[in-house]
Amino acid sequence: MKALLTLGLLLLSVTAQAKVYNRCELARILKRNGMDGYRGVKLADWVCLAQHESNYNTRATNYNRGDRSTDYGIFQINSRYWCNDGKTPRSKNACGINCSALLQDDITAAIQCAKRVVRDPQGIRAWVAWRTQCQNRDLSQYIRNCGV
């Protein structure tokens, strides 16, 4: 009985853990989902963005005390504008999704919402981390030896 309880707790802890992609795995998934060149944004920019926003972690969250919003998932998509978490005052939910969808190991919803973000006038500049860590830099290291 004790062994079954231990096994159950172990399985529960494994399912609660986030998927943390490596850069090449992420680059291949993003390329397969049409992100390379989407709205003029190169694949290396997306990988750089994900590294600096979430360290490639699908379950990353960051609460912003100032406007009481939260950033969700591998791209740290904000609940004030892009998704609904049921907690953020005056949320716009421009992606039309629940924020929990951005925390899945399957990042399809996060990719679709990121595409929606870059269709806005700010484009990829909507992400502070991209402006401070990726913009105007040589990003070739982010996709080097990835076969993409």
Swiss-Prot record:
Annotated GO MF terms: lysozyme activity
Sequence ranges assigned to domain C-type lysozyme in this UniProt record: 19-148
An annotated GO cellular component: extracellular region
EC number, as in UniProt: 3.2.1.17
Tagged with keyword Cell inner membrane: no
InterPro entries for this protein: Glyco_hydro_22, Glyco_hydro_22_CS, Glyco_hydro_22_lys, Lysozyme-like_dom_sf
This protein's record includes keyword Hydrolase: yes
Tissue expression per record: Expressed strongly only in small intestine.
Example GO biological process: killing of cells of another organism
Cysteine disulfide links: C24-C146, C48-C134, C83-C99, C95-C113
Signal peptide: 1-18
Key words, A-Z: Antimicrobial, Bacteriolytic enzyme, Disulfide bond, Glycosidase, Hydrolase, Secreted, Signal
Family: Belongs to the glycosyl hydrolase 22 family.
Misc remark: Lysozyme C is capable of both hydrolysis and transglycosylation; it also shows a slight esterase activity. It acts rapidly on both peptide-substituted and unsubstituted peptidoglycan, and slowly on chitin oligosaccharides.
Name of the featured protein: Lysozyme C-1
